[in-house]
């Protein structure tokens, strides 16, 4: 609620149908409003000219259309863009747009801060402040699309998406709906550090791609760098990956942050092959992006090449991700801090 009014951007189409039914309005009105919000980017009810004036007046009295505008934006040497959004309560989140030859990918946030405390991640050094609403999640996409076209959406920004599953699922239903933002399920990926029960629920409620931040091949190492592993160790996590419902020939993305001397050896590569032998997956190797919040180091190029080559020799689909946006602290594991501090003059 905002000033006693409902934020209409927090409503799925079914929610909006129910909201309007309480006003005695027809179901098709909800579809009209949805299209105005997400396909015509309406930011006021007055713009919705195919709605009766009395309905527009009623909506203005009982509802608001929330919005986000970037407070700041930085552009990396490689074209990556980082957007800072200030929320209604003064908190901030960041989104990152990654341009590639044939597409653009928008990395969006789902929480202010993060409670997962992954040792290699700068965002994890900021305590969780709160969950984002569905509207705050969706509005990141709406705002960036006013600047540049967006083809892919990844929930890999600030926060653990599955720790805010109610609002993330609502946002996904808006993102995927034909009357909403109209993204194909193939173009939307949700990343998790490994919240097993929530992985199962996500698979039941929506059809999206799944990325799992694995980063270790033994429980001993994963316990150290990802506290979530103490609750859901590798055995449970990999079982959840095996049972996650993906249509057709799609694969789960396994994200593997390579850290020098910790998880970058040939033996790690061999264990990874065994762990994933019966899971339909593709592997993203992510050389660790060094930052002031952590003493870990990036792996040597030779170690990366050996690791990559071994996975290829075992017929895995594998990509070694280049570091995008590291000069503006927009690379994997670097979100939150620098841009906000620059704006605030700290």
Curated annotation (Swiss-Prot):
Keywords: 4Fe-4S, Cytoplasm, Disulfide bond, Iron, Iron-sulfur, Metal-binding, Methyltransferase, rRNA processing, S-adenosyl-L-methionine, Transferase, tRNA processing. It catalyses: adenosine(2503) in 23S rRNA + 2 reduced [2Fe-2S]-[ferredoxin] + 2 S-adenosyl-L-methionine = 2-methyladenosine(2503) in 23S rRNA + 5'-deoxyadenosine + L-methionine + 2 oxidized [2Fe-2S]-[ferredoxin] + S-adenosyl-L-homocysteine; adenosine(37) in tRNA + 2 reduced [2Fe-2S]-[ferredoxin] + 2 S-adenosyl-L-methionine = 2-methyladenosine(37) in tRNA + 5'-deoxyadenosine + L-methionine + 2 oxidized [2Fe-2S]-[ferredoxin] + S-adenosyl-L-homocysteine. S-adenosyl-L-methionine binds at residues 159-160, 191, 213-215, 289. [4Fe-4S] cluster binds at residues 114, 118, 121. Pfam families: Radical_SAM (PF04055), RlmN_N (PF21016). Binds 1 [4Fe-4S] cluster. The cluster is coordinated with 3 cysteines and an exchangeable S-adenosyl-L-methionine. GO terms for molecular function: 4 iron, 4 sulfur cluster binding; metal ion binding; rRNA (adenine(2503)-C2-)-methyltransferase activity; rRNA binding; tRNA (adenine(37)-C2)-methyltransferase activity; tRNA binding. Belongs to the radical SAM superfamily. RlmN family. Reaction proceeds by a ping-pong mechanism involving intermediate methylation of a conserved cysteine residue. This is Dual-specificity RNA methyltransferase RlmN. The gene is rlmN.
């Amino acid at each position: 609620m905002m000033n006693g009014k409902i934020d209409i951007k927090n409503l799925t189409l079914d929610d909006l149908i129910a909201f309007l039914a309480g006003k005695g309005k027809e179901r098709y009105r909800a579809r009209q409003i949805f299209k105005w919000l997400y396909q015509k980017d309406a930011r006021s009810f007055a713009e919705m000219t195919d709605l009766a004036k009395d309905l527009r007046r009623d909506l203005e009295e009982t509802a608001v259309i929330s919005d986000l505008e970037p407070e700041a934006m930085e552009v990396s040497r490689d074209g990556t863009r980082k957007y800072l959004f200030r929320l209604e309560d003064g908190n901030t989140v960041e989104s990152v747009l990654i341009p590639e030859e044939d597409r653009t990918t928008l990395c969006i946030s789902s929480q202010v801060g993060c409670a997962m405390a992954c040792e290699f991640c700068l965002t994890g050094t900021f305590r969780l402040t709160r969950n984002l609403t569905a509207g705050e999640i969706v509005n990141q996409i709406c705002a960036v699309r006013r600047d540049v076209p967006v083809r892919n959406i990844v929930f890999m920004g600030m926060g653990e998406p599955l720790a805010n599953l109610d609002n993330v699922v609502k946002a996904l239903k808006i993102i995927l709906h034909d009357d909403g933002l109209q993204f194909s399920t193939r173009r939307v990926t949700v990343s998790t550090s490994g919240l097993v029960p929530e992985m199962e629920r996500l698979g039941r409620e929506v059809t999206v791609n799944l990325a799992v931040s694995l980063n270790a091949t033994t429980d001993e190492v994963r316990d150290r760098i990802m506290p979530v592993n103490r609750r859901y160790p590798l055995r449970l996590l990999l079982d959840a990956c095996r049972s996650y419902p993906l249509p057709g020939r799609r694969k789960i993305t396994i994200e593997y942050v390579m850290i020098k001397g910790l998880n970058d050896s040939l033996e790690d590569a061999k264990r990874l092959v065994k762990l994933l032998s019966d899971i339909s997956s593709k592997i993203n190797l992510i050389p660790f992006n060094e930052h002031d919040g952590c003493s870990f180091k990036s792996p040597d190029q030779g170690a990366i090449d050996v690791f990559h080559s071994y996975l290829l020799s075992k017929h895995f689909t594998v990509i070694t991700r280049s570091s995008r946006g590291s000069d503006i602290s927009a690379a994997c594991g670097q979100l939150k801090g620098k841009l906000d501090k620059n704006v605030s003059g700290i």
